[in-house]
């Protein structure tokens, strides 16, 4: 074979090789089978196939890749759901404490002139109450020290048995109930004709109930175990001002030493011929800083000072109906009402109940 013939054969072989390689590249580089097969036939005939371009040396040129910007497939981003804070359950509004009752005066006399308990008295009385509570005094009991003006049935007993009508003074009803059982009790320290000195005399104590050498006041405190002691004396202490003062102070000292709150009450009469004994009672209450139940201020407003024909004992009022104007003209009616007022004040302001 001549050299010329050999050269021609090599050229033909080279062309065949190039064509074969180009065909293989076309098969490899054509669109993906999945997408092409899925496309409709019409789409495959959309345009002529571009001729294969050959580069130098007869090798077909590789197609320049077309940069297709990546299609941003929208990834479904979960919209943040704002988790609501738990709804605050409103706290129940505290039930407002009942407003303290507005005390009512009597017959135009201001409450503060009848029940004398300024802050220093309340503070001192709380100390006495605390001492009594520590040794077991009964906060629901009170006792009486007095003469015939404080005997049953006229003094306080109706508040144990009924009927009664407090009317405008109905705010006192809780105090009635708190001290139930003491109102109508026969006190060992209440006797007809009792003086301040006989209240401290063991010979006036109740036989069989009281211990040897025990005074009526001491005996009553031991037997009834009260937290409060109402002291209503002075009518029978005539012409003995100095002794009345010292005897009353002895009763007050006995009560305080026993952890019992002494409450001093004034009287409506002028049996001693002046108002000396009431002045003494007021002075003792101030000196000891203990509650003063100044009934005498109300007696000033009553016809005949609320006294019976003997000018010593009070006139009675059986009905105990404080809606009846007659009640406000009678000694025992006002005596009982104001005594209940001072018990209420001690209970609320000192005992804290």
Predicted regions and their residues:
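Hydrophobic single-pass membrane-insertion segments
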Residues: 23-37
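N-terminal module-boundary/linker segments of secreted carbohydrate-active enzymes
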Residues: 96-150
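Conserved SGNH/GDSL esterase-like catalytic core that processes O-acyl groups on lipids
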Residues: 114, 135-243, 316-320
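Loop/turn elements at helix/coil->beta-strand transitions in domains of secreted/extracellular proteins
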Residues: 138-141, 224-230, 256-263, 288-291
């Amino acid at each position: 074979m001549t050299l010329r013939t050999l050269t021609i054969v090599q050229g033909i072989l080279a062309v065949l090789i190039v064509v074969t390689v180009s065909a293989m590249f076309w098969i490899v580089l054509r669109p993906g089978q999945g997408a092409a097969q899925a496309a409709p036939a019409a789409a495959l005939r959309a345009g002529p196939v571009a001729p294969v371009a050959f580069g130098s040396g007869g090798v077909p040129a590789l197609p320049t890749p077309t940069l297709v910007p990546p299609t941003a497939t929208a990834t479904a981003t979960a919209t943040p759901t704002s988790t609501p804070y738990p709804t605050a359950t409103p706290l129940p509004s505290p039930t407002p404490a009942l407003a303290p009752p507005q005390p009512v005066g009597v017959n135009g006399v201001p409450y503060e002139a009848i029940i004398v308990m300024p802050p220093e008295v309340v503070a001192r009385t709380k100390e006495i109450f605390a001492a009594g509570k520590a040794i077991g005094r009964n906060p629901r009991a009170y006792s009486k020290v007095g003469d015939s003006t404080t005997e049953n049935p006229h003094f306080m007993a109706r508040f144990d048995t009924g009927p009664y009508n407090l009317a405008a003074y109905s705010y006192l009803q809780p105090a009635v109930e708190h001290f139930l059982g003491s109102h109508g009790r026969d006190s060992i320290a209440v006797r007809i004709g009792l003086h301040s000195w006989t209240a401290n005399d063991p010979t006036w104590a109740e036989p069989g109930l009281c211990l040897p050498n025990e005074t009526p006041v001491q005996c009553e405190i031991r037997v009834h175990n009260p937290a409060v002691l109402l002291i209503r004396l002075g009518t029978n202490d005539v012409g003995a001002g100095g002794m009345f003062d010292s005897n009353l102070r002895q009763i007050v000292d006995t009560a305080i030493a026993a952890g019992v709150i002494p409450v001093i009450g004034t009287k409506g009469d002028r049996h001693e011929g002046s108002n000396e004994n009431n002045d003494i009672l007021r002075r003792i209450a101030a000196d000891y800083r203990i509650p003063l139940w100044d009934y005498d201020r109300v007696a000033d407003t009553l016809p005949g000072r609320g006294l019976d024909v003997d000018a010593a004992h009070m006139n009675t009022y059986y009905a105990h109906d404080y809606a009846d104007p007659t009640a406000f003209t009678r000694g025992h009616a006002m005596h009982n009402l104001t005594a209940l007022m001072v018990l209420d004040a001690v209970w609320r302001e000192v005992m804290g109940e």
